[in-house]
Amino acid sequence: MRTWIAILAVVLVLLLNACTDGPEDGPRLEHPDETGVLRVVTRNSATTYYLDRHERAVGPEVALVEAFADHRGWTVDWTVAATTAEVLDYLEAGAAHLAAAGLTHLDSRNQRFERGPAHTEITQQVVCHRDRTDKPRSPEDLEEVVLKVTAASSYVERLEVLAERYDALTFQEDQRGSEQLLMAVEEGRLACTVADSNIVRLNRRYLPHLDVTMDLTEGQNLGWYLAEGQERLAQQAFEWMNSRAGDEVIAAMENRYYTYVGEFDFVDLRALKRRMESRLPRYQRHFEQAEAETDMPADLLAALAYQESHWDPQARSPTGVRGMMMLTGRTAESLGVNDRLDPEQSIMGGARYLADRHERLPEHIPEPDRTFLALASYNVGRGHLLDARQLARDLGRDPDDWQEMREVLPLLSDERYYPNLRYGYARGYEPVHFVARIRNYRDVIRQAFE
């Protein structure tokens, strides 16, 4: 009797597992030409798909897929998987037409799926802090450096191969993802790490002390994979990606997400002081008027505007934001800004937006923490800040204390945490640096408003 009960229990567990979320085998998907819908599986990361501060899906893969679908007259139905393995499971089960998840084209994958077009060439790169004097420039030099790399990654496989040739080469596997390890290098907490070149390029925009010392591999292709039986769709994808229109979209994607900005002079005190003399006087009264309406301090607004545009009313970025406060068209419209290039309107719009972020935070949060959290929300989006505050509670940290939150926010890009967050992946180190720079600027700018 107990044997039959055990068998029934196993069957019940299997049935329950079959009902859980995840890919399910089923009829092959109809072609998007017939349904008008392209079903795509991806994963959360800065190089694939994430929600921006306005909770819009953005990312390199999003830009390419949406352009391809728009060219064909289709809409896109996105599924976000937790891991690369889960992405491939969805595709193998026929739950998606296409996987666009920063996938390296590999022989093993080519045997399982219909290979789609490649869009990005990468290499694995060794990255160290730029002030380090003994940077490794060759495999032999790696014997003198203890590397930390993401556990169970392609980096581990490559280093294991090299370790067979160089006996003194050592490395440690770490549960943190590439972005977390790059941040540790930036902050001087880690000597060197290894990451894909596209991840490095993207993060150097915000982590200016990273230095690529050598390539560990030759070029590898990132691209799409399609479900078995989707040969016609694969051909359409190849034709579009290799067309002039496809080339233009790839170039725009490269410019938006990967162009290296570097430090330039956003940390240059001399440049700031020059602009305080040459530019700030033209706009100071607008900051003061915005303070009168919103109660946001004029010197804080001036520091925010300097961070956003260096007080350039004609500023624009590849992402489509424009003006002194670098507002999107939709945000500007919601704030009553008719002309984003009008500095008075732009400053008032940015002040209203920051005031809204401030007012939406609990009143019990003391200053200056409430203002710092409002700035973080301004930068990364309210949804992602709410995720970070909940994560802080889960970790036993204080969500009202900025010193605590500046350590929690970067975890929004940690794959140990973001799959379980409502708004998913975010480059959580960005708001930390954003707030720090504004605080530094404000300390200098304050004298002009006293």
UniProtKB/Swiss-Prot annotation:
Q: Which GO terms fall under biological process for this protein?
A: cell wall macromolecule catabolic process; cell wall organization; peptidoglycan catabolic process
Q: What is its EC number?
A: 4.2.2.n1
- What reactions does this protein catalyze? Exolytic cleavage of the (1->4)-beta-glycosidic linkage between N-acetylmuramic acid (MurNAc) and N-acetylglucosamine (GlcNAc) residues in peptidoglycan, from either the reducing or the non-reducing ends of the peptidoglycan chains, with concomitant formation of a 1,6-anhydrobond in the MurNAc residue
Task: Give the span(s) annotated as Non-LT domain.
Answer: 21-261
Q: Where in the cell is it found?
A: Cell outer membrane
The secretion signal range is 1-20
Q: Name one GO molecular function term.
A: peptidoglycan lytic transglycosylase activity
Keyword entries, A-Z: Cell outer membrane, Cell wall biogenesis/degradation, Lyase, Membrane, Signal
Report the coiled-coil segments: none
Recorded GO cellular component terms are:
cell outer membrane
InterPro entries, alphabetically?
A: Lysozyme-like_dom_sf (IPR023346), MltF (IPR023703), Solute-binding_3/MltF_N (IPR001638), Transglyc_AS (IPR000189), Transglycosylase_SLT_dom_1 (IPR008258)
Which positions are catalytic residues? E308
Principal localisation? membrane
Give the family per the record.
In the N-terminal section; belongs to the bacterial solute-binding protein 3 family.
Provide the domain comment. The N-terminal domain does not have lytic activity and probably modulates enzymatic activity. The C-terminal domain is the catalytic active domain.
Q: What is this protein called?
A: Membrane-bound lytic murein transglycosylase F 2
**Which species does the entry assign this protein to?**
Alkalilimnicola ehrlichii (strain ATCC BAA-1101 / DSM 17681 / MLHE-1)
This chain is encoded by the gene named mltF2
